[in-house]
Amino acid sequence: MNLAGKVAIVTGASRGVGAATAVALAEAGCAVACAARATDATPLPTPGTLDDTVRRITDAGGTAVAIPTNLAADDEVRAMVATTVERLGPVDVLVNNAAITFPGDLELPMKRFDLVFDVDLRAPVIATQAVVPGMIERGSGAIVNVSSAAALNYYPGQMAYGMAKAALEHLTMSLAAQLRPHGIPVNTFRIDVPVASEGFVAALADIDHSDWEPPEVAAEGILWVLRQPAAVTGRQFGMARLRADAGIMESRSARPHTQAPGMVTASHLDTPPPAR
């Protein structure tokens, strides 16, 4: 997809990978709707707000709007899409990036379990339901679901998060099959190397982050996926594989990715991306 002149929604755009992706899309010529909870008026403990992201974009001459959204609330997710259409125009690109997690496996209270699934899985489904009719009508569009190595591996205390990400990757596969006849690609971008987003740095403050990727590296990968032909759909693109096969994201160069403490690995299911 040629991103110039397109309208994009990025969830979780107040900080980290979401903010970096919103900025990168604006630099590519998109008008960007930035959605999340944190604003200047209603900040969260972790640094970063929607207003920060929008200022970065508009100060550089781009177009962006902040759409405060509680992604655990169905009506607010639908309103996010409706507001984007009202303020920027029909949605061409949806990046389902927002995610939350809580520590705990089987002992995790169901209220928190449900909240993880509401934000990490249900919100992407509802947002997709809201944007797809317009994409089908126009015969174009693209959706990227941002996943994690937790979809394929067990990290102690992250059972619900891993389950939600695994389901999100299945959503990609299912949507790709349904939307292929309409020329609308749906792909997964899997973050499978450490990224120094504000949230993870705060949560893992005792770990050395010096060789972690900056969020901008993940954003570069997401835009690479969006720029592929519409025939490239239903794929799971991992950051590590894209670095090796697509020649992007070189900040860690040839340094091997070290396995996180306590991680139990599963077989890697990525397929190689197409030639550029």
Locate predicted features.
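Conserved glycine-rich cofactor-binding loop
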Residues: 7, 14-15
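Conserved glycine-rich Rossmann-like NAD(P)H-binding loop of the short-chain dehydrogenase/reductase
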Residues: 28-50
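Conserved mid-core segment of classical short-chain dehydrogenase/reductases
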Residues: 46-49, 78, 99-114, 157-160
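Catalytic Tyr-X3-Lys loop
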Residues: 99-100, 109-126, 140, 144, ...
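Active-site helix of classical SDR
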Residues: 128, 164
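Alpha-helical segment proximal to the catalytic Tyr-Lys
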Residues: 133, 177-178
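Residue(s) in the substrate-gating loop at a strand-loop-helix junction
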Residues: 148
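C-terminal helical subdomain
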Residues: 181, 188-189, 205-275
